[in-house]
């Protein structure tokens, strides 16, 4: 049907007869000659229809609508010198048509323009409702082709490293310790339910027990959670697991994987190895375990300097076991007014969204003089002021913003304010050259965090992470006592403030796995019910193993420069977890529900 793709034609094809297929991007009549921009996935080529080639051919071209599907036959020839279009890869040539067949006309009204020449923004809701049309747009086609290149590159790298791709079940059982599951009722096993996998975590560990040694999968995962711009109810992970490798070997292999992807897709040589921060270092310096290191304004813990200060907001927070931290805004005196920091201001609101009651501030003037509210200025002695300015590095013209209270709240508030000001003040460079891809491994996470509402420990990552050997010791009788304070052999890869993926070494000792499950409050009987198949496997010669998973939707979002992963997925859901094109989810018939022995108790409020 076609001999060439539209976008592949070049000067070397001059004098060749070609057959092309594609969509009419636009059609225009210039002085009795019709020019058709014919578009397919590969690009666009100019078709020239001359009346000298035949009246019927010319008449057919005159009646074409945009997005009509065509087959064109013709001769490749050079464009006149004054008609060369340097913006197109095919801009030095055109095809003189000698045949035109409409393969499918457009009979309905187009909801929006697809043409590469029309950059008019289209509302996302309209794009998602007519996604089949939206996918023809150059931007979306380019994004999906880049996604393909990214995944293809990852597959080739892993296969060259001895990994094999194995598919794991999509219908599995529901397990605790995660987001909500998507549940699927079983018709055959009445009253019982499958769950769609949130990750292939347990199956990939079982593959290691099964002796496969190196596994990967481009896995579909499902989580019933509240959505953001970078979240979807169904998403794609590059899932990797390997036996007989320590943490250092795993990190180095995956650095090479990421570097290979960036080289293939962006043509960039990433500097290796990636920097590393421990979890505690990241929290102390940035207030988050996924810091954006492209700009400064790091957090400073000034609790030791201000613990005896007469300003009770500060000294009281420290006495209660909390902390006082600050960030220094360069030239903040000129850039930020008091109104923005006080209640109702945008900076105040950012801190409040993170749970803080507000922010205190100091303005540094000439000769190291300071301005602030009286309660701070009057209670800050000369020694404290000198120590504060020295530790923060603040100089004349700078603004110091303080958070005081529970350390977790202070970290969260100042992290949010730091990110907000980084964007507002233009501290984050916009051109993405090699220096601005700031990769970072965060390592040595705590094994557990406290769930204050339920007054119990929860696994910070998941309950299958192996604890640090030095923290745990070799005496199984002491493990229960040591586990709550242990670090996990876990690691996350962060890029420019976004988590790309994470993983850990896994527990391969059955008794240790039981004790970890008990530490998070799972009774032994329930642990055996939920995870008995895993514990049984660990008792049958499980090798040391570990791995990680990368969020491919997010990686592609960053590589394309998009703001939302919805623009890197062919058929995404909205933030209400709906597909506007197919109108999913939708109701089902009573007969279907009866077969499943399921009854809906939902009542339409209208």
From Swiss-Prot:
Signal peptide: none
Annotated positions binding ATP: 223-225, 232, 499, 551-554
UniProt GO MF annotations: aspartate-tRNA ligase activity; aspartate-tRNA(Asn) ligase activity; ATP binding; nucleic acid binding
Keyword Protein biosynthesis applies: yes
UniProt superkingdom: Bacteria
A Pfam family reported for this protein in Swiss-Prot or TrEMBL: tRNA-synt_2
GO cellular component, one term: cytoplasm
Subcellular location: Cytoplasm
EC number: 6.1.1.23
Swiss-Prot/TrEMBL GO biological process terms: aspartyl-tRNA aminoacylation
Location of region: Aspartate: 201-204
Binding-site list for L-aspartate: 177, 223, 461, 506
Family: Belongs to the class-II aminoacyl-tRNA synthetase family. Type 1 subfamily.
Purpose of the protein: Aspartyl-tRNA synthetase with relaxed tRNA specificity since it is able to aspartylate not only its cognate tRNA(Asp) but also tRNA(Asn). Reaction proceeds in two steps: L-aspartate is first activated by ATP to form Asp-AMP and then transferred to the acceptor end of tRNA(Asp/Asn).
Protein name: Aspartate--tRNA(Asp/Asn) ligase
Annotated source species: Prochlorococcus marinus (strain MIT 9303)
